[in-house]
């Protein structure tokens, strides 16, 4: 895309599709503002009414919000509920034969699970955990599983009997798995023999064996193994048991445990943390309410919709928008075992056509990859079923946004560019597809009931166009409740740096800019903000600008020490296929990229170093490992865990380039 065209495109406002808006839950900005006003007028009444209307309670709550021990807030106090019941049982009267889950395996196999079947399988699994493994309310269960339907059964079975599940992403190393098991003091670990990835078997059980060897996890009593790829594995007698052989002997009737609103539903350890893992603790009622509300508001989920979120269940997006959100709404959710590129880069588009997907939610990294590797693949498929597109995980640059909007959504689907975190449980800032005028790469407005503000360090609001810290200034139901076993770390991490009206507010760790209309644009992590000669520059906006060069497929920018400026900008750049970059071309390309930066951001944003690389190191969830790139740029030893990488060879190739340049 030409720079001038891109600048104009980024300013353009896209109004919701009129036909879609007419039938949407929130049809226009007036209705959005009415909800915001309602929440502001009586905050507790607003949330209390939603909880009464949307959730099924065994015993009603008697207090909406208890702030006596802030920041350890309690929502819907003394209410009794069960998340599994709300995701399955309450739908059985009218939807027992409706499809709950559509599963497609990497090798092309598929399975369709109705709500009745889901109820039966979850109950049998819950009974297995209780009867054979002595799992009780409050026990922690580690789930180290691939994207298969049994993973959902395990989650909901834990919720049914009151156990606290903690999913560890199946790409994590044995060491990372061990750390999480020990921090949670888990009684049981559930894994699979393996899965299929890129058309080949990929093993998981050996990683569990290594994590548990030499009694390294003394809290673990037993391990439960799901047979998926049927490759040979080792068994430890008395410890390892096969799920497939045991589950069908269990009754398909299991009464749901009555849980307090504030009882923990799950722990999820934040990715990329250093030192002791940080177990984000989420509650039952508040989390589920917001999972359901954001499905209804942000995706405008409908009874006959097929919803597909491409995230892995090892991340919060998979928890909320693959499992709990869709099922709480009684919707149909899709699960794909494998990758976007096998057998080719048309896989996702074929699935959208075949399963008539209505709402599609994925990451900017995936969009950029599909654009670069298979730009014309979508043209081979009928994507007319799509009504809403969504992005999650990082800011999306205008070029990727434009391709997603025009080629995938046929210029008729709203893109909900959602901002939220593991700690928030669900969306915080997002357009509403039937109401919000959208702009490329802009998260737009806080959802009703959410008080998200951009503040300076002293707690004052930033002026329009100024960078600041994105904070949430009032508690909300799905917020993180604690860091497992570490209250001090919870306070230090989120409620210790910025005050508003004398009270500490939730600090997200993200930087943002608010414009004169209240629209919020995320500029990246505050630790991804580079201070160049006293000017704070978000690496995300630098990357977005560089990506507008026609030869650049994608890039990652990090800050490096500079004796004059404090910090300088170092870019790792992936060029389009066939592009060659000798010394002369390299200097010319650097000049062109810096020109784009000077136009888009200002002359202060200037690349000091560029390394042209064949690819960027990414986790299997699609996130770029920026800390690793920063170590490379600063010529420091690589100490990061590389086991989560999609392709370790990328790092080896980058290191070879570094050695050649030394």
UniProtKB/Swiss-Prot annotation:
Alphabetically list the UniProt keywords.
Acetylation, ATP-binding, Ligase, Magnesium, Metal-binding, Nucleotide-binding
On the tree of life, the source organism's domain of life is: Bacteria
Any one GO cellular component localisation term in the record:
cytosol
Identify the CDD domains for this entry: ACS
GO molecular function list: acetate-CoA ligase activity; AMP binding; ATP binding; metal ion binding
Gene3D superfamilies given in the database record: 3.30.300.30, N-terminal domain of ligase-like
Which residues are ATP-binding?
393-395, 417-422, 510, 525, 536
State the EC number(s): 6.2.1.1
BP GO terms, sorted: acetyl-CoA biosynthetic process from acetate
List residues, modification N6-acetyllysine.
Answer: 623
Q: Name one Pfam family in it.
A: AMP-binding
Instruction: Locate the residues binding Mg(2+).
Output: 549, 552
The keyword Acetylation appears for this protein = yes
**Co-factor(s):** Mg(2+)
Residues binding CoA are: 197-200, 317, 533
Q: How is it modified after translation?
A: Acetylated. Deacetylation by the SIR2-homolog deacetylase activates the enzyme.
Catalysis: reaction(s): acetate + ATP + CoA = acetyl-CoA + AMP + diphosphate
Q: Which family does it belong to?
A: Belongs to the ATP-dependent AMP-binding enzyme family.
Function of the molecule: Catalyzes the conversion of acetate into acetyl-CoA (AcCoA), an essential intermediate at the junction of anabolic and catabolic pathways. AcsA undergoes a two-step reaction. In the first half reaction, AcsA combines acetate with ATP to form acetyl-adenylate (AcAMP) intermediate. In the second half reaction, it can then transfer the acetyl group from AcAMP to the sulfhydryl group of CoA, forming the product AcCoA.
HAMAP family in alphabetical order: Ac_CoA_synth
- The protein depicted here goes by the name Acetyl-coenzyme A synthetase
């Amino acid at each position: 895309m030409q720079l001038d065209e891109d600048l104009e495109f980024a300013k353009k406002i896209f109004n919701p599709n009129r036909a879609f808006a007419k039938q949407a839950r929130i049809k226009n900005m007036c209705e959005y503002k009415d909800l915001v006003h309602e929440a502001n007028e009586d905050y507790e009444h607003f949330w209390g009414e939603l909880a009464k209307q949307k959730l099924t309670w065994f015993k009603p709550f008697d207090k909406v919000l208890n702030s006596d021990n802030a920041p350890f807030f309690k929502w819907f106090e003394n209410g009794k509920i069960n998340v599994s019941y709300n995701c399955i049982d309450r739908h059985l009267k009218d939807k027992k034969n409706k499809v709950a889950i559509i599963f497609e395996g990497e090798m092309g196999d598929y399975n369709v699970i109705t709500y009745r079947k889901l109820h039966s399988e979850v109950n049998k699994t819950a009974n297995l955990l209780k009867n054979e493994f002595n799992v009780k309310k409050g026990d922690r269960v580690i789930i180290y599983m691939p994207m298969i339907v049994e993973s959902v059964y395990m989650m909901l079975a834990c919720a049914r009997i009151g156990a606290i599940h903690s999913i560890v992403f199946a790409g994590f190393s044995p060491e990372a798995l061990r750390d999480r098991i020990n921090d949670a003091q888990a009684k049981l670990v559930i894994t699979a023999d393996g899965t299929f990835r890129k058309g080949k078997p990929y093993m998981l059980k050996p990683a569990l064996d290594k994590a548990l060897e030499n009694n390294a996890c003394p809290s673990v009593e037993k391990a439960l193994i799901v047979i998926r790829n049927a490759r040979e594995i080792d068994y430890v007698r008395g410890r390892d048991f096969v799920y497939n052989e045991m589950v069908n002997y269990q009754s398909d009737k299991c009464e749901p445990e009555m849980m307090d609103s504030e009882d923990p539903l799950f722990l999820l350890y934040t990715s990329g943390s250093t030192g002791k893992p940080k177990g984000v603790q989420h509650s039952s009622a508040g989390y589920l309410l917001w999972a359901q509300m954001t499905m209804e508001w942000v995706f405008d989920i409908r009874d006959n919709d097929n919803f597909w979120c491409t995230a892995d269940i090892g991340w919060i997006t998979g928890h909320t928008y693959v499992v709990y959100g869709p099922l709480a709404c009684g919707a149909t959710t899709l699960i794909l075992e494998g990758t976007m590129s096998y057998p080719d880069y048309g896989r996702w588009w074929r699935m959208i056509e075949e399963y008539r997907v209505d709402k599609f939610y994925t990451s900017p990294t995936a969009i950029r990859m599909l654009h670069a590797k298979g730009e014309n693949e979508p043209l081979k498929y009928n994507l007319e079923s799509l009504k809403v597109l969504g992005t999650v995980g990082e800011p999306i640059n205008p070029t990727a946004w434009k391709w997603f909007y025009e080629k995938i959504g046929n210029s008729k689907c709203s893109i909900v560019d959602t901002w939220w975190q593991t700690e928030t449980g669900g969306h915080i800032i997002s357009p509403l597809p039937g109401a919000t005028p959208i702009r490329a790469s802009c998260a737009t407005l806080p959802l009703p009931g959410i008080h998200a503000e951009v503040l300076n360090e002293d707690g004052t609001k930033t002026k329009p166009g100024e960078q600041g810290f994105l904070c949430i200034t009032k508690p909300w139901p799905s917020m993180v409740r604690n860091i497992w076993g570490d209250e001090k770390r919870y306070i230090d991490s989120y409620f210790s740096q910025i005050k508003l009206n004398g009270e500490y507010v939730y600090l997200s760790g993200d930087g943002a800019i608010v414009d004169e209309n209240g629209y919020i644009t995320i500029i990246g992590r505050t630790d991804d903000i580079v201070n160049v000669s006293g000017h704070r520059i978000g690496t995300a906006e630098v990357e977005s600008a560089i990506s507008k060069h026609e030869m650049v497929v994608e890039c990652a920018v990090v800050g490096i020490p500079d004796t004059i400026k404090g910090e300088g900008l170092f870019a790792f750049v992936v060029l389009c296929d066939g592009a060659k970059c000798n010394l002369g071309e390299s200097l010319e390309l650097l000049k062109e990229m810096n020109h784009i930066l000077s136009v888009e951001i200002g002359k202060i944003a200037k690349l000091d170093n560029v390394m042209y690389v064949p690819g960027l190191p990414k986790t299997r969830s699609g996130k770029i490992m920026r800390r690793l790139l920063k170590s490379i740029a600063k010529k420091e030893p690589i100490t990061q865990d590389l086991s989560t990488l999609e392709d370790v060879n990328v790092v080896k190739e980058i290191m070879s380039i570094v050695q050649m340049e030394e």
